[in-house]
Swiss-Prot record:
Na(+)/H(+) antiporter that extrudes sodium in exchange for external protons. InterPro entries: Na/H_antiporter_dom_sf, NhaA. The keyword Ion transport applies. The keyword Transmembrane applies. This is Na(+)/H(+) antiporter NhaA. It comes from the Bacteria.
Length: 396
């Protein structure tokens, strides 16, 4: 296993702890005497004006549309690297996690739709339980240390990357508002410029970021969700260059700490603050949180494991070396940790929704993700060899 991958796993595991702390802090603030201050902080207007350009949004939307675009830039870089030289670089390597990812998105979406089919406004949240939070999932897996086979970690990483691709496609197709053709034309021109730079071998990252900023503003104004600009820029950064051995890896390594220790925790802090005032068991059992909770905790493992098992039995794919189906099932439960990615989709699905869909969706995400994390950890622990525990008791 490469040093790059080892560093990535360690970083994502540490990020999971900070994410939990940020989410817990948000919950405490939202349910304390500081709740109004917490909400006022998120509603703080932030305006950027350059000549005729004027962007005026509350801080919450700057976090969701701006900072998360940087996170999706990192996702684009990771996906491209894995497709060119990593876990998705060959058909044999990519087939198993790709099939698992498809099953892991379909089953939760169907379960959610089953509970909310009669409510047109609530149906907009069908994709919420389809996402996986890679930082949390890898963080839980990291608690078991060296007992976890490397091939199992690679499977989870590859599956999560394929899952991210699916989320990107879902956002582009289903959560796009009314389009502005003028802004869209500027976005297309910026994309073509990035493609031209890539084709001619341009490896100055600063130039890509400059054109990428133009693309982000254009996409923001066009009605397409602005985070997609980050994905496009990520795909356009060249893997090999002259100034750097790999501009893509150089930028990826530079962005990882910012994403892991600032962007995702800040997003969690801004979106996880659910007020529990007036929320009881009946609230949790209402269609939106119930659909999300069961989609994550039941639908994810059902979809991932069932499709994985069938693909192996039918000879379409093969199990990673050193991995058994008990471990695949445990990982499939961990895939139900939707947290930040599910909350991101919820912020799009219910951006203009009425009632308490936003709060209810976050409640379902928190409960479903927590159940998936706890049960997934226990299932994985029981499925793994106990050699590390044996070694740790030798000196006692």
């Amino acid at each position: 296993m490469s040093d790059v991958f080892k560093k990535f796993l360690k970083l994502e595991a540490a990020s999971g702890i900070i994410l939990i702390m940020a989410a817990v802090l948000a919950m405490i603030l939202a349910n304390s005497g500081l709740a109004s201050g917490y909400q006022a902080f998120l509603d703080t207007p932030v305006q950027v004006r350059i000549a005729a350009l004027d962007i005026n949004k509350p801080l919450l939307l700057w976090i969701n549309d701006g900072f998360m675009a940087i996170f999706f830039l990192l996702v684009g870089l990771e996906v491209k690297r894995e497709m060119l030289e990593g876990a998705l670089s060959s058909r044999v390597q990519a087939t198993f996690p790709a099939i698992a990812a498809v099953g892991g998105m379909l089953a939760p979406a169907l379960i959610y739709t089953f509970f909310n089919y009669s409510d047109e406004a609530a149906r907009a949240g069908w994709a919420i339980p389809a996402a996986t939070d890679i930082a949390f999932a890898l963080g839980v897996m990291a608690l078991l240390g060296k007992r976890v086979p490397v091939s199992l970690k690679v499977f989870l990483l590859a599956l999560a990357i394929m899952d991210d691709l699916g989320v990107i496609i879902i956002i582009a197709l289903f959560y796009t508002q009314q389009l502005s053709l003028e802004a869209l034309a500027v976005g297309i021109l910026a994309t073509l410029t990035l493609l031209w730079m890539n084709r001619r071998g341009e490896d100055r990252i600063g130039l890509y970021m400059l054109v990428g900023l133009v693309l982000w503003v254009a996409v923001l104004k066009s009605g397409v969700h602005a985070t997609l600009a980050g994905v496009v820029v990520g795909f356009m950064i060249p893997l090999n260059g002259k100034r750097y051995a790999s501009p893509l890896k150089h930028l990826e390594h530079a962005l990882h700490p910012w994403s892991a220790y600032l962007i995702l925790p800040l997003f969690a802090f801004a979106n996880a603050g659910v007020s529990l005032d007036g929320i009881g068991l009946s609230s949790l059992l209402s269609p939106v949180p119930m659909g999300i909770m069961l989609g994550l905790f039941v639908g994810k493992p059902l979809g991932v494991f069932t499709i994985s098992w069938l693909s192996v039995k039918l000879g379409i794919a093969q199990l990673p070396s050193g991995v058994n189906f008990k471990q695949i099932f445990a990982v499939s439960i961990l895939c139900g940790i939707g947290f930040t990615m599910s909350m991101f989709i919820a912020s799009l699905a219910f951006e203009h929704g009425g009632l308490d869909y936003g709060s209810y969706s976050r409640l379902g995400i928190l409960v479903g993700s927590t159940l998936a994390a706890v049960v997934g950890y226990l299932a994985l622990r029981m499925s793994l060899p106990n050699r590390e525990a044996d070694q740790s008791t030798e000196g006692l």
